[in-house]
């Protein structure tokens, strides 16, 4: 009898030759899958989230943005005073209980006006950003994917609109249609001239992604051009669009405040940080704090969106991780 060999099994052929066959690995399939999952590379967004979680500025900006959005959506939760309730007896009154920022020259509560002023500014920024992303991303995707004369036409139209400064065009149009001054007119004007950069970024990103191997594989499976564009190219081109949109949102808030500051933005019946800053500048020496609070709210909100955009860009940019 041959000796027992635990690690091998002996088999004989008809010629009498011995062959040694190793034992079957009895490692469970679940354990193999677990190891494979742990060793699998994380997705781009997963790596970006891991990077963002380590950035204190990202969390500070995120908290400020969440607070600004909540204030603009539910201002009545943060103050019980109406922004248009004014009493001349409170002329430049000092801060007191329930009125932590004091009063304006007309006796209005500064804190209430800062709270309600967030609604107009943040709403214009968010809605304008949504509009320019829809317009710019659509045109940029079509131009970058189809190419040819369609790309040439869209690119030339984009260059024409890009050559016109956003704020200057907004001033001209708001003056031309001043009888229709409202929040929707401001959003329309800013969207009409603010989509060009998004279109150029999307076009470049789509042209880069459409040459990737997974797009070639999708074509080999017989997928239609529009299915490839919507299911494969656009989802993988979103990173630079999201980064720019976050930064642009802050820019649109500044644009609205600038128009209201000049008296050609929102109507005087609407509360706006820009309009309050414009009124407070007339008596800056006598009461600087009347200007300080709306200006600080505007600066913090805009800076938070810009910081958020920079943090996301660095998290998604492989060169920034080195």
Name each region found by the language model:
Residues 205-214, 311-319:
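Transmembrane helix boundary and interhelical loop/hinge segments in multi-pass membrane proteins
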Residues 108-123, 127, 147-155, 207-211, ...:
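Amphipathic cytosolic juxtamembrane alpha-helices at the membrane-cytosol interface
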Residues 162, 173-177, 190, 206, ...:
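Glycine-rich helix-loop "coupling/hinge" segments at transmembrane-helix boundaries
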Residues 75-83, 144-148, 173-179, 193, ...:
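Short helix-capping/hinge motifs at transmembrane helix termini and TM-loop junctions
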Residues 100, 110, 134-136, 144-145, ...:
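Generic hydrophobic transmembrane alpha-helix motif, especially the helices
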Residues 119, 161, 165, 177, ...:
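Residue-level hotspots within pore-lining transmembrane alpha-helices
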Residues 1-137, 141-142, 149, 163, ...:
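Gly/Trp-centered helix-boundary motif
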Residues 30-31, 120-124, 139, 154-157, ...:
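Short alpha-helical transmembrane interface motifs in multi-pass membrane proteins
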């Amino acid at each position: 009898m041959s000796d027992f060999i635990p690690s091998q099994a002996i088999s004989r052929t008809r010629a009498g030759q011995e062959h040694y066959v190793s034992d079957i690995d009895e490692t469970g399939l679940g354990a193999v899958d677990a190891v494979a999952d742990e060793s699998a590379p994380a997705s781009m967004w997963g790596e970006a989230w891991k990077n963002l979680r380590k950035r204190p500025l990202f969390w500070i900006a995120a908290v400020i943005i969440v607070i600004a959005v909540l204030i603009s959506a539910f201002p009545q939760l943060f103050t019980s005073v109406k922004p248009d309730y004014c009493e001349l007896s409170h002329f430049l009154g000092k801060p007191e209980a329930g009125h932590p920022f004091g009063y304006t020259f007309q006796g209005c509560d500064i804190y209430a006006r800062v709270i309600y002023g967030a609604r107009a500014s943040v709403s214009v920024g968010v809605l304008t950003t949504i509009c320019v992303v829809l317009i710019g991303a659509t045109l940029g995707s079509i131009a970058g994917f189809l190419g040819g004369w369609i790309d040439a036409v869209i690119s030339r139209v984009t260059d024409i609109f890009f050559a016109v400064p956003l704020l200057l065009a907004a001033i001209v149009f708001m003056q031309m249609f001043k009888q229709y001054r409202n929040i929707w007119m401001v959003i329309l004007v800013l969207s009409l001239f603010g989509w060009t950069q998004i279109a150029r970024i999307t076009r470049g990103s789509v042209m880069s992604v459409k040459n990737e191997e997974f797009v070639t594989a999708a074509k080999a499976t017989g997928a239609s051009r529009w299915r490839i564009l919507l299911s494969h190219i656009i989802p993988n081109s979103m990173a630079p669009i999201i980064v720019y949109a976050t930064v642009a949102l802050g820019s649109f808030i500044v644009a609205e405040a600038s128009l209201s500051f000049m008296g050609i933005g929102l109507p005087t019946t609407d509360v706006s940080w820009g309009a309050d800053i414009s009124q407070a500048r007339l008596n800056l020496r006598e009461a600087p704090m009347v200007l300080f609070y709306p200006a600080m709210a505007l600066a913090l909100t805009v800076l938070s969106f810009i910081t958020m955009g920079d943090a996301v860009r660095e998290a998604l940019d492989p060169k920034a991780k080195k």
